[in-house]
Amino acid sequence: MIIKPRVRGFICVSTHPTGCEANVREQIDYVKARGPIANGPKKVLVIGASTGYGLAARISAAFGSDAATLGVFFERAGSETKAGTAGWYNTAAFEKFATEKGLYATSINGDAFSDEVKARTIEVIKRDLGQVDLVVYSLAAPKRTHPKSGEVFSSTLKPVGKAVNLRGIDTDKEVIKETVLEPATQKEIDDTVAVMGGEDWQMWIDALLEAGVLADGAKTTAFTYLGEKITHDIYWNGSIGAAKKDLDQKVLGIREKLAAKGGDARVSVLKAVVTQASSAIPMMPLYLSLLFKVMKEKGTHEGCIEQVYGLYKDSLYGAAPHIDEEGRLRADYKELDPEVQNRVQELWTQVTNDNIYELTDFSGYKTDFLRLFGFEIAGVDYEADVNPDVQIPKLVQV
């Protein structure tokens, strides 16, 4: 079938298998061109491995450090008549290229919050790898079923304590709009912490430690975004911020446990990029469009693969890691450059319906958004017939 982008709100409901493969190849080529990561990881578990930062973490480990990788995610296969999810095609492509290079690559498809997926992951590590020396936690999910109580929690994107008026772009109509977000209730805050906080990361590490599948000296990192004052009402000071603060608390206990084995645990702060998660946040398309404009002009613009490869090389496995006073690894320092933030802040109030394309890089934002789903990739023939039924040969389905 011939597949074209079909966008509804902040989701593209179609995906292009060939485009997703080309996108993965571009990221692999970037890592290969930058050269190997000195003293990098060799056996890596990535939880949330199929898109965005998690996929970049898997690619960087495999092609920057010749690592065996095990990826966990929750994706949907395609059929002859219906496209699957982008993460499915990304993984099929990644496994194909990793196998061609002679690298171990296996994937587990299921709910990473569940005990079943944790148990199955441990089985596969024991069978194939023995132990892992890096665990990357990169889950982005709107809901979580608690593995012990069975309670279902939903995350909420709201301010805390006061209503907030946010500027943003209506990405369908391409106009500036103001959105009023009412404050979260205590239950909404608690539920957001249950979904996006550090409990599941801690459960993963505890399960891996108990099973004896974490190598001596093993590291773990969880990815997060903090942003600057322009996004603070909705991030750091909002319901999501409560979850991020929980992550900062939970990492201390995880670090202590791993330190006993000569290892380490860190929260890694990455820059704002276009992802399926960020496009759902009312102000982010406008913020990202302005950020892209300013950072591209400065020559400091980066996407997922540049960020994560840099995080591995400079901080996770570098001699002089970028670390803040809270002990977090920072890869977002180019975004937080005061010159960049001040310029974004200046432009923030100047943007109108008439000058969106002039003052912002909204066209770059739209391209990046479509690239998530395998569209707008150079060299791909979008008029060609494509089969959406793509297999992942080494998939473990839970």
UniProtKB/Swiss-Prot annotation:
It is an enzyme of class 1 (oxidoreductase). Its EC number is 1.3.1.9. Keywords: Fatty acid biosynthesis, Fatty acid metabolism, Lipid biosynthesis, Lipid metabolism, NAD, Oxidoreductase. NAD(+) binds at residues 48-53, 74-75, 111-112, 139-140, 244, 273-275. GO terms for biological process: fatty acid biosynthetic process. GO terms for molecular function: enoyl-[acyl-carrier-protein] reductase (NADH) activity; NAD binding; trans-2-enoyl-CoA reductase (NADH) activity. Substrate binds at Y225. The record marks E75 as: Plays an important role in discriminating NADH against NADPH. Pathway: Lipid metabolism; fatty acid biosynthesis. Coiled coil: none annotated. Involved in the final reduction of the elongation cycle of fatty acid synthesis (FAS II). Catalyzes the reduction of a carbon-carbon double bond in an enoyl moiety that is covalently linked to an acyl carrier protein (ACP). Belongs to the TER reductase family. This is Enoyl-[acyl-carrier-protein] reductase [NADH]. It comes from Paraburkholderia phytofirmans (strain DSM 17436 / LMG 22146 / PsJN). The lineage of its organism: Bacteria, Pseudomonadati, Pseudomonadota, Betaproteobacteria, Burkholderiales.
